[in-house]
């Protein structure tokens, strides 16, 4: 883009950018309100707003830069001033538009791209040009200017130079030699900028930031110097407290932000109307800094950022109205050129020649006027053509004058006065001198206020440093006290643990002695039990041998007795027993014999009783018959009695035989019973011996064996416990010695810690004093030491340590 001519009038360029709906708005199903009738217009609420260009939500960062800010680079390098600032409500995308993601070719904003393009243009310009580039970065936070490159500089004041151009006095100016250094300055400033979290934005800017790039170029041959300033402004967004939920400090920040933006809107409105003689630039520091950008000597580009959401419709309309008003503002731009002595001399000669010509023309006009007044008629050919001369003079003035000269010959604005007559040149000069004097006094007061503020800030910083040092010392003392208490508590705990361990060891030793005594006692009892067991075993063996011998002796008798029993059984026809005589054991055989004998005895008794009863009946009948016979009543009956008597006599041998057999049976029974009793007695003796040496002895033996097993187990457990305790005893003693050593070490460490803390405290105080002295010395040196300028010559490729970054930014801007 070719630079405009000096004194050219140009309007403020306004571009509109609509961001996409964010996640919250999409989640709330907000409607997308704006419509785009054309590339340079936007419709909202039935009203159409026209700007230089409208960027839709899908517009990339590169397209925004190419369309809105690319031409500013050439203007700045041609000696013009330039301004780019973004305006809009909070969370509308201003910081994203101005800064973006630095280092990302796709997401980087206007500032990194414009920085890269400035150096790319410099590298392609005439090699006889030498550039001096310096940057400043400051913010307006709560109506106070803070230096972002030096956070210690706060509440900086605004002054005016000899051309009545406002500037921030005392702001750090860092000379740079490449895009990397500029981006590093931006990163340093961003880390010091005020941001906060609100309901509408996680990284809400709480201040207006101004990044100023001053490019001064000098031609080595002609010594011609041009100076261009580029203001890159990121405004904080206007806020509604009901939406952002601001409280406390954030609320106060929002108030100051809205106040400065309101002052900016008033200035825009005053400039847009063009009828007001006074524009309130001094109402806010923001408008004071942007004074040249709004209605002054600057090519200004305004990017209004707006939200498309129905939720923010009112703020979006206000933003669009602001842009429409700003578009009507007209600036008068001039080249900031510093002339050499030869150029001033040439222009002086030219002005002198022009004045001579004008003087001759004025003299000719005066002669013509005198002739007319004298009544002489002057022919038309002799008339002096003042219009051509005036046009020539004006063209010469406009073509050869400098901005400084034009400012010097420009009429001063009328001063307010109480006189009703015309203001003379002397009064005008007087008023001008008074105004200059008042401005000088105002600047002096600003300087005094600035000095007092700086001194106050230094004192405040010193107080803060002292408080921090005191707080640190108190914290260190508290930490040391806590550590001391902790060490003491640990030492007491260790001592208590040592005492408990000694007590436990003593108890273990006592228990060990008791267990050893019990073990010895159990050993003795075990020996006694073993001896008793051995004697019982011997007695059992003897009883067993005696029993076997007795059984051997009784074997033939038992067999003889069995044979007798079998004979008796055969005689009495006990078939069931006879058939089982070979299979039944002795005791079963005896039982069966007892049953058989009892049965025979019962039959014998029954037969004896029946025969006795029959005999008694027969005797009774016989006596009765004898009585009847004696009485002679029945002879026949007598005969019968005789027959019966004869029968009785015949039966008597049988009865005798039965009686003899019964006697034999009784004798046999007695013998059998005797043998059986003897056998049973022998069995009872044997069983008695068995009972004496059997269940009771076995039960006692079992009891003793169980006790023996238990005692054996207890003995083994005691032996194992004793062995374990003997193994653990050296470990416990070692641990006890270790704990005692640890207690001693902790006590020593506690003493050393106290000594170190005291030494560190003294060292810290000395270090604080040294740092303060170094800061004092550095500040003293800064006051008198010059700045080192980094010249840049076109045609020489710039190399930096981070070449990738310097290469990536230009490519991203030219893509």
UniProtKB/Swiss-Prot annotation:
One MF annotation (Gene Ontology) recorded for this entry: ATP hydrolysis activity
PROSITE patterns: KINESIN_MOTOR_1, KINESIN_MOTOR_2
Keywords of this entry: ATP-binding, Coiled coil, Cytoplasm, Cytoskeleton, Microtubule, Motor protein, Nucleotide-binding, Transport
Compartment(s): Cytoplasm, Cytoskeleton; Cytoplasm
Superkingdom of the organism of origin: Eukaryota
Reported consequences of knocking out the gene: Conditional knockout in PVD neuron results in a complete microtubule polarity reversal in the anterior dendrite. Conditional knockout in motor neuron reduces the number of mitochondria in the axon. RNAi-mediated knockdown results in reduced dendritic branch formation in PVD sensory neurons. RNAi-mediated knockdown results in an altered distribution of recycling and late endosomes. RNAi-mediated knockdown results in defects in nuclear migration in hyp7 hypodermal precursor cells.
Keyword Cell membrane: no
One Pfam family this sequence matches: Kinesin
Biological process annotations from GO: anterograde axonal transport of mitochondrion; anterograde dendritic transport of neurotransmitter receptor complex; axon guidance; embryo development ending in birth or egg hatching; establishment of meiotic spindle localization; establishment of meiotic spindle orientation; establishment or maintenance of microtubule cytoskeleton polarity; locomotion
Region of interest: Disordered: 788-815
Composition skew (Polar residues), residue ranges: 797-815
Annotated ATP binding sites: 88-95
Annotated coiled-coil segments of the chain: 335-374, 422-554, 695-785
Ranges where the Kinesin motor domain occurs: 11-329
Domain description: Composed of three structural domains: a large globular N-terminal domain which is responsible for the motor activity of kinesin (it hydrolyzes ATP and binds microtubule), a central alpha-helical coiled coil domain that mediates the heavy chain dimerization; and a small globular C-terminal domain which interacts with other proteins (such as the kinesin light chains), vesicles and membranous organelles.
UniProt family annotation: Belongs to the TRAFAC class myosin-kinesin ATPase superfamily. Kinesin family. Kinesin subfamily.
Protein name in UniProt: Kinesin heavy chain
Organism: Caenorhabditis elegans
């Amino acid at each position: 883009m070719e630079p405009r001519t000096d004194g050219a009038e140009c309007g403020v360029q306004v571009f509109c950018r609509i961001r996409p709906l964010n996640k919250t708005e999409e989640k709330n199903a907000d409607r997308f309100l704006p419509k785009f009738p054309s590339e340079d217009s936007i419709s909202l609420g039935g009203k159409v707003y026209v700007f230089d260009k409208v960027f839709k939500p899908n517009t990339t960062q590169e397209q925004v830069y190419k369309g809105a800010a690319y031409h500013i680079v050439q203007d700045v390098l041609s000696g013009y001033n330039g301004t780019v600032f973004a305006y809009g409500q909070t969370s509308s995308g201003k910081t994203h538009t101005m800064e973006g993601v630095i280092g990302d070719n796709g997401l980087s904003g206007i500032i990194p791209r414009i920085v890269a393009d400035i150096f790319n243009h410099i590298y392609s310009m005439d090699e006889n040009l030498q550039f001096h580039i310096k940057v400043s970065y400051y913010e307006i936070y709560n109506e106070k200017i803070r230096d972002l490159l030096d956070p210690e500089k706060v509440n900086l004041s605004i002054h005016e130079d000899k051309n009545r151009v406002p500037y921030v006095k005392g702001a750090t100016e860092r000379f740079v030699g490449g895009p990397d250094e500029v981006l590093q300055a931006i990163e340093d400033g961003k880390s010091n900028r005020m941001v906060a979290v609100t309901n509408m934005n996680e990284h809400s800017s709480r201040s207006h930031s101004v990044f100023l790039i001053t490019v001064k170029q000098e031609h080595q041959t002609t010594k011609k110097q041009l100076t261009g300033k580029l203001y890159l402004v990121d405004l904080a967004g206007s806020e509604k407290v009901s939406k952002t939920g601001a409280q406390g400090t954030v609320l106060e920040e929002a108030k100051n932000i809205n106040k400065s933006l309101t002052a900016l809107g008033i200035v825009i409105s005053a400039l847009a109307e063009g009828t007001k003689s006074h524009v309130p630039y001094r109402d806010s520091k923001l408008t004071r800094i942007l004074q040249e950008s709004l209605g002054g000597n600057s090519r200004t580009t305004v990017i209004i950022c707006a939200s498309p959401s129905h939720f923010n419709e009112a703020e979006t309309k206000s933003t669009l109205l602001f842009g429409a008003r700003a578009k009507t503002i007209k600036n008068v731009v001039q080249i900031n050129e510093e002339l050499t002595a030869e150029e001033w001399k040439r222009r002086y000669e030219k002005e002198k020649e022009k004045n001579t010509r004008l003087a001759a023309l004025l003299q000719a006009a005066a002669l013509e006027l005198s002739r007319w007044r004298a009544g002489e008629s002057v022919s038309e050919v002799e008339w002096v053509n003042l219009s051509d001369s005036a046009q020539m003079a004006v063209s010469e003035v406009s073509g050869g004058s400098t901005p400084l000269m034009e400012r010097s010959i420009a009429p001063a604005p009328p001063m307010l006065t109480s006189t009703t007559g015309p203001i003379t040149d002397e009064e005008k000069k007087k008023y001008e001198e008074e105004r200059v004097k008042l401005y000088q006094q105002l600047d002096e007061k600003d300087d005094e206020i600035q000095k007092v503020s700086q001194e106050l800030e230094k004192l405040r910083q010193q107080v803060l440093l002292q408080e921090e040092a005191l707080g640190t010392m108190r914290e260190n003392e508290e930490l040391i006290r806590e550590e001391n208490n902790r060490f003491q508590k640990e030492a007491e705990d260790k001592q208590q643990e040592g005492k408990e361990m000694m007590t436990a060891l003593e108890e273990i030793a006592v228990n060990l002695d008791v267990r050893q005594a019990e073990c010895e006692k159990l050993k003795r009892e075990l020996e006694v039990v073993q001896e008793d067991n051995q004697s019982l075993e011997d007695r059992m063996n003897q009883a067993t041998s005696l029993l076997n011998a007795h059984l051997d002796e009784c074997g033939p008798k038992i067999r003889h007795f069995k044979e007798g029993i079998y004979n008796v059984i055969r005689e009495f026809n006990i078939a069931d027993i006879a058939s089982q005589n070979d299979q039944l054991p002795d005791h079963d055989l005896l039982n069966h014999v007892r049953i058989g004998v009892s049965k025979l005895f019962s039959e014998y008794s029954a037969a004896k009783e029946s025969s006795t009863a029959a005999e008694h009946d027969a005797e009774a009948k016989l006596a009765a018959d004898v009585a009847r016979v004696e009485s002679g009543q029945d002879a026949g009956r007598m005969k019968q009695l005789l027959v019966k008597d004869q029968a009785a006599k015949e039966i008597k041998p049988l009865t005798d035989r039965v009686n003899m057999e019964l006697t034999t049976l009784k004798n046999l029974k007695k013998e059998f019973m005797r043998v059986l009793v003897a056998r049973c007695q022998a069995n009872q003796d044997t069983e008695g011996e068995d009972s004496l040496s059997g269940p009771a002895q076995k039960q006692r033996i079992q009891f003793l064996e169980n006790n023996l097993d238990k005692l054996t187990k207890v003995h083994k457990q005691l032996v194992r416990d004793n062995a374990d305790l003997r193994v653990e005893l050296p470990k416990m003693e070692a641990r006890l010695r270790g704990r005692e050593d640890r207690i001693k070490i902790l006590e020593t460490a506690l003493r050393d810690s106290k000594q170190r803390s005291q030494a560190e405290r003294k060292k810290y105080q000395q270090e604080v004093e040294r740092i303060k002295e170094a800061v004092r010395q550095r500040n003293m040196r800064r006051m008198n030491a010059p700045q080192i300028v980094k010249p840049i010559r076109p045609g020489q490729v710039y190399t930096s340590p981070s070449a990738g970054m310097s290469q990536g930014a230009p490519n991203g801007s030219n893509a």
